[in-house]
Structure formats: C-alpha cells, structure tokens
Amino acid sequence: MLNLTRTAAIGALACALSAPVLAEAPDDNPGFEKDREAILAMAGNYDVTFDFRETVPLAEGYEVKEPKLSGGYEIVRVIEDTGEFISLQHILVVGDEGEEFPIKHWRQDWTYEPSEVLTFIGGNAWEMRPVPASESEGQWAQEVYQVDDSPRYGAVGDWTHDNSVSQWTPPAEWRPLPRRDMTTRDDYDAVLAVNRHTITPFGWVHEQNNSKLVLDENPHVLVREIGVNTYRHFEDYPVEVGDDYWTATKDYWAGVRAEWEALEDAGEPFGLTMQGEPEALYQPLLELAGEVEEGTTPTQDAISEASDVIAEYTTTEIGTLSSRVNDAPEKEDGAY
C-alpha cells in the first residue's frame, strides 16, 4: 500500500455508485449489451499494481532504464451511465492504516459509435478528431482524463468476446508522457500507445504496448515499453474513504468537467499554456476539491475559482508542434 502524506501524495500521483442502465441493444449490434457489461465490470474495489518495463532500445546508444513498479488501493465508480455513454471515476485510497485518505485519480469515458474522439496532438495540446460513420459502427471510444479532469488521450476500438474473453483493443494513438517520466526525463516527447483492456476472473488488466517518440526534425522511436496495470478485486481496506470523498466533491468535479467539455465542444484545437509537468494547473483544482470536502469553500465558489484557473492555463493559440515541444522545460539535474 502507498505510504504517503496527503500533500506529497497529491504531487506524486497527479500523474456515489450509480445503478446500471438497462440499455436497449441496437438492432445492428447484438453484442452491445456484452460490451456494456465488460465496461461496467471495471467498476469495483481493487488492489492495483502498475508494472512498466522498457524492452527494446531503438536509438543508437540508448540504454534501457530500470523497471518502474508501484501499486495501491483503488476504487472505480460508475458516475454516469446513459446507455451509450459510461463514465468511470478512479479514486486511490492511500496512507498508513487508520490514517487513509483519498486521491482523485484518472477517469475513463466510454462512448458507443462516437462521431468524434479526443486526440492528443503533442506538446500538451489536443483536438477533437471526427470519426466517420464507417469507422465508428459498432465501436466504442475510450477517452481518458487526468486527475484534474484535463484531457489525456482517446481512441476508438472494438470490444470482442471471443473464446469467453472480453477485451477492447484500439489502433495505436499518441498520448502525453506519463507522470513517472514527465517529472524526470526530457529525452522523448510523446508515447505511441496501443491499449488493451481485458476482463479477467479476478478483475481486469490494462495492458500497454508503448513506443516512446522523439518529435524533433527527424522523428523516431527511442525505446519500446510494456506496461501491465493489474486490478484485482480486494475489499480489505476502507473503501468508504474514497466513496465519502466522492459524495462530498462530485458536484464540484461535475462543474470542473463542464469547463473542460466546453473547450472540447468549441471545435478548435486547444492546449495548455505551459509545457512539461502542469502542477500549476492540477494542484489548485485538487486543493479546491479538498476545501469543498472540508466544507470551507462552497461548491459553486470552488467551481468559479476552478474556472478561472483553467482559463489561465489553457489556450486555443497552440502554435506548431515544433514550437510546443521546444518550449518544454528541462528537467532537474540527475534526471534521465
């Protein structure tokens, strides 16, 4: 279990149950309800391990780095289910026994037969990419969001249920650096990733086949990496710590999501006004959630302040990919 103080954990990791909807299956996809069951099966209480290992160096002189292993307790809750849209919120429960506290983690949104999908375009910038009907038929988009509900990446793929195994695998898509590398490395700029979500008898597994990209005048792959995030059903920790946090803050986070959704819905590419680790953005938003949880700041006041923070650190004047990548700050001495 993670052993962190509340302040340290927020920095280190910023890297109400909802009843399922009985959705009517589309006439052209009898597997629709199986798809939904697989997505909803990812909700629950878990002991999670995160295992990332570089495997194949592809740039001359590059040496594979040590594996990065971590883990913790995590609850996953269905926060919205309208049939063809499902949203799952992850919340970590960390700290010593008897002193556990919650940390809002990532969110995954699932949309059936999407007309567009969130796409990372490098250098802390995103756009909504149109998805032709021929590509979205029978497919699900997964869009992933950061701890502060800012965007991370998205992709469109097919849930399959062959040989009694439910899994979703999309084509490769770009994504930002993970926080485990964002704070320590400046030798690559983006990840070309293939995801696989697989439902297992013990929970589910998120597999990643990652290629770490250098986006200079000669774009190339630095190294390949395999990631396996394993979610095992586990109840022997105070899951109510996470649930109580969500009950207290869910209206605030709904307001924050609305601010980000407005940027997506505007139809223009958008990005952050900073490159590298966006602590100046996520830290105030998490702190405002803490104030709402403690009752020291009213929810609507916190949403208004969060809106100002998001406005300060976002822009539609994103420039070129080259300019964004070159503006990324250098990491501290000793980073690799």
What function would you assign to each model-found segment?
Residues 1-10:
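Bacterial N-terminal signal peptides that target proteins for export
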Residues 18-20:
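N-terminal signal peptide c-region/cleavage motif recognized by signal peptidases
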Residues 29-45:
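N-terminal helix-cap/turn-to-beta initiation motif at the start of protein domains
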Residues 87-161:
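Low-complexity, serine/threonine/proline-enriched polar segments
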Residues 137-192, 212:
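Short helix-loop boundary/capping segments
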